[in-house]
Amino acid sequence: MEARDKQVLRSLRLELGAEVLVEGLVLQYLYQEGILTENHIQEIKAQTTGLRKTMLLLDILPSRGPKAFDTFLDSLQEFPWVREKLEKAREEVTAELPTGDWMAGIPSHILSSSPSDQQINQLAQRLGPEWEPVVLSLGLSQTDIYRCKANHPHNVHSQVVEAFVRWRQRFGKQATFLSLHKGLQAVEADPSLLQHMLE
């Protein structure tokens, strides 16, 4: 779930709790769409009050993947006024958030860690032609880029993966998410690229 959507759920937590959202079809819909597991449903239903049930649902949702917030909105068919409130809050948060602000919500130990192979692979899938200026801003040379291209002449994805793996090997502990964020900012690449890697 995106940082902005987590913020919306946090800011409306008490209001949502007061609506006792778990009594209708909400849980069933979230289960059907694969957002909640059977264990989640049992855990929520075991709570003694409607407020506690809703609060537990709100605690679980942020960790249930990128589609959780939109699926939650879809589940609120019986509560159109709640859905409207959430959509409005989301628009306001989006308007307020400068692109780099979601970084503030990421723990420092993650920012100072290096991306895994899987995360580099994810980034390579999303990065377009701007990958070359990004790796140059991270400290690789034109020669490095040339080698990556020579090693994988017909596969841009593999060129990008190799370039970031070289960056990680060469810079060791300095090859962090934070330096990657700065590299993306330096070439004005889409900052949400990093967000997707960390979800």
Swiss-Prot record:
Keyword set, alphabetical order: Apoptosis, Cytoplasm, Nucleus
Single GO biological process annotation from the record: cellular response to mechanical stimulus
PROSITE patterns according to UniProt: CARD, DEATH_DOMAIN
- Coiled-coil segments: none
Molecular function per GO = death domain binding; protease binding; protein-macromolecule adaptor activity
**Which Pfam families has this protein been placed in?**
CARD, Death
Q: Which InterPro entries does the record associate with it?
A: CARD, CARD_RAIDD, CRADD, CRADD_Death, DEATH-like_dom_sf, Death_dom
Q: Where in the cell is it found?
A: Cytoplasm; Nucleus
Specify the CARD domain's residue ranges. Answer: 1-92
Q: Where is the Death domain?
A: 116-188
Pull one GO CC term from this UniProt entry: nucleolus
Q: What is the role of this chain?
A: Adapter protein that associates with PIDD1 and the caspase CASP2 to form the PIDDosome, a complex that activates CASP2 and triggers apoptosis. Also recruits CASP2 to the TNFR-1 signaling complex through its interaction with RIPK1 and TRADD and may play a role in the tumor necrosis factor-mediated signaling pathway.
Q: What is known of its domains?
A: The Death domain mediates the interaction with PIDD1 and the formation of a complex composed of 5 PIDD1 and 7 CRADD proteins which in turn probably recruit 7 CASP2 to form the PIDDosome. The Death domain mediates a direct interaction with the Death domain of RIPK1.
What assembly does the database describe for this protein? Forms a complex named the PIDDosome with PIDD1 and CASP2. Interacts (via Death domain) with RIPK1 (via Death domain); the interaction is direct. Interacts with TRADD. Interacts with TNFRSF1A.
What protein name is recorded for this chain?
Death domain-containing protein CRADD
Q: Where does this protein come from, organism-wise? A: Mus musculus (Mouse)
